């Protein structure tokens, strides 16, 4: 059994097989997931697991170098948006690295998920609570 926080086998495999610049999406319960992209569905019920809890575990598992967000996220769901940015800031402080933050339209975001290695679906029901992580390197 793993000693670290991530117990989900599919997410562990994903993290172990990612290469530099690969993208992974963590999304709310409602984001459409392209048929050709691997779906890792964690959603149990409304809000479980939460978007932020899932992000925290992913950040503890995988090295990132940037994120992509929908422009609408900050305006429609400011509390969740700020919580995500706080997690990103904490990760930057912990790693001593600076991550890029890119905002695109929600429509462009949905199209971009088609390039993700996987989409991790949470039970989050907050509008636009979605992030694309760009994978970095640990060296």
UniProtKB/Swiss-Prot annotation:
Disulfide bonds: none annotated. Keywords: Carbohydrate metabolism, Cytoplasm, Isomerase. Its EC number is 5.4.99.62. One of its GO terms (cellular component) is cytosol. One of its GO terms (molecular function) is intramolecular lyase activity. The active site is at 20 (proton donor). Belongs to the RbsD / FucU family. RbsD subfamily. Homodecamer. Catalyzes the interconversion of beta-pyran and beta-furan forms of D-ribose. HAMAP family: D_rib_pyranase (MF_01661). This is D-ribose pyranase.
